């Protein structure tokens, strides 16, 4: 049988499907997620249920968002899970997660994310950060390194700044390719994202911060002065105490927020 077939389902490349099969890893992830009935538990991309089954067993109801119609049908007919699940068939990148919030309950979101959409999905989820208590995701190890990077690190970029603006980022464990069927060509890792109740560096307009980061990191090897010359003058960099000769990966989240807030003040 092809290595792409697992539990009778053929992994679909266009959906980025690699199914988690290592029980030890599954148990550790479920322990990190800490399922409970005090939150709305939400799984993105339940796949064949490696995380779905142990999480659903521990709680009264689990909401899942799954794009693959074949997998949705399997879940709807699952002898154990069908009565525990609220299933939304659709694209998580387009999904309005705020509709899942109920009074007095924030979301706990988790999933073994398709690696081909993980970065845009992170940006989408940050828009709902105020409604989310915790997020636990299996990602390409390289993406976890980007999420958790420090200034000056080559992995530090736009995703880093936006993730650390919204959340505390905690790498949880590394997962080798043989823990999946079929094995991916890259190493994986689990990350915990804890949205801030109060942001350490509040931004006056997060859209300005997002655009500033996009512009700054568009040409990583060039200086801030070069990349942001249409946005901030040398005098304004000096006022902020930021050296415009530095490269974008050398600037902290706090400094990016300070620059964005200055842009907001100029636009007011």
From Swiss-Prot:
SUPFAM superfamilies recorded for this chain? S-adenosyl-L-methionine-dependent methyltransferases
Top-level EC class, please? Answer: transferase
Q: State what this protein does.
A: Specifically dimethylates two adjacent adenosines (A1518 and A1519) in the loop of a conserved hairpin near the 3'-end of 16S rRNA in the 30S particle. May play a critical role in biogenesis of 30S subunits.
Subcellular location as annotated: Cytoplasm
Give the source species: Shewanella sp. (strain MR-4)
Name this polypeptide is given: Ribosomal RNA small subunit methyltransferase A
Output the Gene Ontology cellular-component terms: cytosol
Q: What is the reaction catalyzed?
A: adenosine(1518)/adenosine(1519) in 16S rRNA + 4 S-adenosyl-L-methionine = N(6)-dimethyladenosine(1518)/N(6)-dimethyladenosine(1519) in 16S rRNA + 4 S-adenosyl-L-homocysteine + 4 H(+)
């Amino acid at each position: 049988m092809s290595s792409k077939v697992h539990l009778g389902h053929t992994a679909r490349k266009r959906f980025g499907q690699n199914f988690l099969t290592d029980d030890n890893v599954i148990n550790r992830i479920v322990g990190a997620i800490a399922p409970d009935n005090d939150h709305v538990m939400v799984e993105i991309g339940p796949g064949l249920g490696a995380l779905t089954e142990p999480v659903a067993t521990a709680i009264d109801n689990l909401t899942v968002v799954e794009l693959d119609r074949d997998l949705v049908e399997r879940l709807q007919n699952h002898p154990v899970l069908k009565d525990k699940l609220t299933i939304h068939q659709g694209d998580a990148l387009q999904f309005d997660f705020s509709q899942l919030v109920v009074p007095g309950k924030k979301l706990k979101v988790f999933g073994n994310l398709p690696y081909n959409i993980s970065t845009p999905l992170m940006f989408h989820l940050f828009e709902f950060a105020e409604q989310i208590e915790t997020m636990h995701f299996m990602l390409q190890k390289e993406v976890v390194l980007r999420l958790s990077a420090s200034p000056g690190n080559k992995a530090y970029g736009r995703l880093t700044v936006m993730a650390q603006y919204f959340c505390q980022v905690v790498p949880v464990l590394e997962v080798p390719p043989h823990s999946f069927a079929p094995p991916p060509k890259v190493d994986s890792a689990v990350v915990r994202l804890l949205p801030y109740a109060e942001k350490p560096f509040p931004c006056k307009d997060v859209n300005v911060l997002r655009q500033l980061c996009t512009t700054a990191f568009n040409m990583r090897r060039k200086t801030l002065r070069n990349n942001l010359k249409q946005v901030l003058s040398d005098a304004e960099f000096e006022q902020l105490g930021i050296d415009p000769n530095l490269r974008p990966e050398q600037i902290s989240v706090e400094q990016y927020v300070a620059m964005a807030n200055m842009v907001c003040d100029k636009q007011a």
